[in-house]
Amino acid sequence: MISKPDKNKIRQKRHRRVRGKLSGTADRPRLNVFRSNTGIYAQVIDDVAGVTLASASTLDKDVSKGTKTEQAVVVGKLVAERAVAKGISEVVFDRGGYLYHGRVKALADAARENGLKF
């Protein structure tokens, strides 16, 4: 019998492979995206120091309304505003092994519109 592939395990494998080649520095930190069934989370991370510089998610009080894609747009806007407030303008986008489509793309576009370059 053919077993059905576990999509999340495949995504995690893809993410590990990409993370081997992608790293954030203090000059150009990594914008990491995690997508769950109910929410979306974004962090700006300096991998050299191992520190999260800015973050936003659907758990924030400002984000609770709208569809998941609309929430992703608000999260992208919030994380960009918080990063720009800390003097970060350029980041490396880490899509977390997800396809660049839907909620991930909406978050990335909103972050670009609000001052992050990647």
Curated annotation (Swiss-Prot):
For this record, the Gene Ontology CC terms, alphabetical, are: cytosolic large ribosomal subunit
Note the Pfam families from the entry. Ribosomal_L18p
The protein's superkingdom reads Bacteria
Disulfides per UniProt = none
Q: Which GO terms describe its biological process?
A: translation
Question: In its keyword annotation, does this UniProt entry include rRNA-binding?
Answer: yes
Instruction: Tell me the keywords, alphabetical order.
Output: Ribonucleoprotein, Ribosomal protein, RNA-binding, rRNA-binding
Disordered, as annotated region: 1-25
MF terms in GO? 5S rRNA binding; structural constituent of ribosome
Q: Which InterPro entries match?
A: Ribosomal_uL18_bac-type, Ribosomal_uL18_bac/euk
Say yes or no: keyword Transit peptide present.
no
Biased composition (Basic residues) is annotated at: 10-20
Spell out the family assignment given in the record's similarity comment. Answer: Belongs to the universal ribosomal protein uL18 family.
Record note on quaternary structure = Part of the 50S ribosomal subunit; part of the 5S rRNA/L5/L18/L25 subcomplex. Contacts the 5S and 23S rRNAs.
Functional description taken from the UniProt entry: This is one of the proteins that bind and probably mediate the attachment of the 5S RNA into the large ribosomal subunit, where it forms part of the central protuberance.
Output this protein's name.
Answer: Large ribosomal subunit protein uL18
Q: Which organism is it from?
A: Streptococcus pyogenes serotype M1
Lineage of source species: Bacteria, Bacillati, Bacillota, Bacilli, Lactobacillales
Q: From the UniProt record, report the name of the gene that encodes this protein.
A: rplR
